[in-house]
A protein has these predicted regions:
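His-Asp-centered catalytic microenvironments across diverse enzyme cores
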Residues: 68-70, 78-174
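Secondary-structure boundary elements
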Residues: 1-37
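Short, solvent-exposed loop/turn and secondary-structure capping segments
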Residues: 20-25, 46, 73, 87-90
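Extracytoplasmic/periplasmic, Sec-exported soluble proteins
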Residues: 1-5, 34-45, 68, 97-100, ...
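Sec-exported extracytoplasmic/periplasmic mature domains
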Residues: 11-19, 51-58, 81, 110-113
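Short, surface-exposed recognition loops or helix-turn segments adjacent to catalytic cores
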Residues: 26-28, 62-67
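Cysteine-centered nucleophilic/redox motifs
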Residues: 9, 34-64, 76
């Protein structure tokens, strides 16, 4: 199932792509090199996970939320069973709802106690608790085509042709 596939890809990413140590330089690179190196910063680790999911046939993307805030959470969204479920690769959180299924952002925002099971008060972003940063978040609109799809030859060709002919790309990313 897509859910099982996503769970395995998430676990593989968390186990095999470690956080880049603070005293190492950050290399902005292709995900293949990040996989070979075995480490990356938060957005690189999320990019590995969402690209692997997309290549395996499960659409996925990552984004920092809330937009235009100093305290942001980098979240990954994966389309499983006709809904966008959410994960936090950097913190190793693959969220589940009260039924034990992979959770959507709306489910987590509606159940702050469940979110606190994952992120204790010790988890902070720029001196703001994880739960507080998470509260009030809304599902972002997925980029189209997805970032990982732009690495697929045919999708990239179509994207570039649409851009060149000013037909629009539906790319609302910052």
């Amino acid at each position: 199932s897509d859910s099982a596939k996503v769970e395995k890809l998430f676990q593989w990413t968390v186990q095999n792509i470690q956080p880049t140590p603070d005293d190492w330089s950050v290399v902005d690179d292709h995900i293949l090199n990040i996989i070979i190196r075995g480490h990356g910063v938060a957005d690189q680790r999320a990019d590995v996970f969402t690209t692997l999911a997309t290549y395996s046939g499960v659409p996925a993307f990552w984004v920092s939320l809330p937009k235009h805030s100093d305290a942001q959470i980098l979240l990954s969204f994966v389309f499983v069973d006709d809904r966008w479920v959410v994960a936090d690769v950097a913190n190793g959180f693959q969220f589940r709802n009260s039924e034990g299924e992979l959770a959507t952002l709306d489910e987590l925002v509606a159940q702050p106690a469940r979110l606190k099971m994952y992120a204790a008060e010790r988890t902070v972003i720029k001196d703001v608790s994880y739960a507080k940063v998470f509260s009030g978040l809304t599902m972002p609109k997925p980029q189209s085509p997805l970032r990982a799809e732009l690495q697929m030859p045919l999708k990239r060709l179509i994207y570039e042709a649409r851009a060149m002919l000013s037909l629009g790309t539906n790319d609302e990313s910052d």
